[in-house]
């Protein structure tokens, strides 16, 4: 399993549009991809799961991936977080 922690830098946190971008990126991979925030873990391929967390600016989130293409998935999600201005 591979994982990485990010600090959310987007002023609006992770709301509908950025959540959709993350879900679309995660869904391109076969690996199981999860997002953990505030003690709760959700499937990052589920828009409802991600939205239910209410992730605000300044939050620390951990994205983990497990499976054959886990490193590719995690690298793509890291790039998405940075390119979309969501986190670092």
Swiss-Prot record:
Keywords for this protein: Cytoplasm, Phosphoprotein, Phosphotransferase system, Sugar transport, Transcription, Transcription regulation, Transport
PROSITE patterns: PTS_HPR_DOM, PTS_HPR_HIS, PTS_HPR_SER
Gene3D superfamilies in UniProt: HPr-like (3.30.1340.10)
Keyword Cytoplasm on entry: yes
Keyword Hydrolase: no
TM helices/strands, residue ranges: none
Means of activity regulation: Phosphorylation on Ser-46 inhibits the phosphoryl transfer from enzyme I to HPr.
Record-annotated active site: 15
Signal sequence range: none
NCBIfam families (alphabetical): PRK13780.1 (NF010352), PTS_HPr_family (TIGR01003)
Record's protein name: Phosphocarrier protein HPr
Encoding gene, per UniProt annotation: ptsH
